[in-house]
Amino acid sequence: LFLLVCRLKSSVSFLTRPDRPNLAYHKLKGRNPGVVFLPGLNSNMNGQKATALEDFCNSLGHAFIRFDYTGCGSSDGKFEECTIGKWRKDVLSVLDELTDGPQILVGSSLGGWLMLHAAIARPDKVAALVGVAVAADHLVTTFKKLPIEAQKEIEEKGEWKFPTKHNEEEYYSLSYDFITEAENHCMLNSPIPITCPIRLIHGMKDGDVPWQISMQVADRVLSKDVDVILRKTGQHRMSEKEDTKLLVNTVDDLIDKLATL
């Protein structure tokens, strides 16, 4: 554990941006395609999936980046001022400033939604996608399923206590403005212009983000090279040993595939 803490603290770098908060990241130099990990909502770059992928890329000699969004983890900025649009720009900053050549994006939950946006915005850079419990449109869809009275109350208070099992409070506090801004980034109502290989991993016991969202993404993207992998006992975080093994093997297969294209 001490070594792990040392590793996490020792090599944090910061991407300085003149007009936006600085982003904390860890970068491993290596061959292409590189791998970039996008964490979930209220998560950070030190999660088990991120570090497992880093170790794997290190063993293979491939480039790897994990980072924190604005207002999350070690990055600058205030979480309560963040939006999906700002986090989308964070992902593009990382791709533009920190990577060279083709990249495989691995997006967890909300990171899966952002990875889809990045693939649309940077088609020349994003060579493949791996989603874990992709949460495309999920916050907006969940909000719109609330009774009208509840929606109005949230609008008046300006705050939505989004239920979660992943912290002590059992909710994430999101502003009403966050939800209205997020509506601009919804993508499941029309074809998604992404043509690269896509792998979508989802646990069928996911109590946070329904696995059917991964099926919708698979249906909407223009890419023909799409696999959906459902784990019958998988939870939302997909961080059991077998889940991690599946994730690493999926990335490994894509690296091989891209090498032969």
Language-model features and meaning:
Residues N42-E54:
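The serine-hydrolase catalytic nucleophile loop
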Residues C6-G30:
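N-terminal cap/lid segment of alpha/beta-hydrolase-fold proteins
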Residues E54-S74:
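Conserved alpha/beta-hydrolase
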Residues I194, L200-H202, D206:
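Short beta-strand/loop motif that positions the catalytic acidic residue
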Residues K205-V209, R237:
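Acidic catalytic loop of the alpha/beta-hydrolase fold
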Residues C72-L98:
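Catalytic nucleophile-loop/oxyanion-hole region of alpha/beta-hydrolase
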Residues A50, C196, P210-D219:
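Short alpha-helix in the alpha/beta-hydrolase fold that links the catalytic acid
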Residues G234-L246:
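Catalytic histidine-centered segment of alpha/beta-hydrolase-like enzymes
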